[in-house]
Amino acid sequence: MPAIDIGRLAVVIAGRRAGQKVVVVDIIDKNFVLVTGAGLNKVKRRRMNIKHLEPLPEKINIERGADDEAVKAALEQAGISLE
C-alpha cells in the first residue's frame, strides 16, 4: 500500500464524500492530512483523518500547501482525472 504523502491521490472511504478522489496537500500530524478536490469534484479543501482515506498508486508533483489552481494544473499535466 502506498504511503500517505504530499501529492498522493486517495479515495475517501468514510463519510458523506465516500468514493470521491482527493489529493493530499499537507500533512497536519500523524492522524490528519489536508485534502482537496481542487474544484474538480464536490470535495472542498478540508482536514481529514488518515483512516478515512485509501491511498492510490498515483502521485502528482506539488508543493506543500499548494492552492487548488496549482493542484488542478498538476493533475491536468499528469493526465489524471478526479471524476
Curated annotation (Swiss-Prot):
One Pfam family of this chain: KOW
Key word Transcription present: no
UniProt-recorded Gene Ontology molecular function terms: RNA binding; structural constituent of ribosome
Cited CDD domains: KOW_RPL14
GO cellular component terms listed in the entry, alphabetical order: cytosolic large ribosomal subunit
GO BP: any one term: translation
Sorted UniProt keywords: Ribonucleoprotein, Ribosomal protein
Origin: domain of life: Archaea
InterPro entries linked: KOW, Rib_uL2_dom2, Ribosomal_eL14, Ribosomal_eL14_arc, Ribosomal_eL14_KOW, Translation_prot_SH3-like_sf
Family statement drawn from the similarity comment of this UniProt entry: Belongs to the eukaryotic ribosomal protein eL14 family.
Protein name as catalogued: Large ribosomal subunit protein eL14
Species this protein is from: Thermococcus sibiricus (strain DSM 12597 / MM 739)
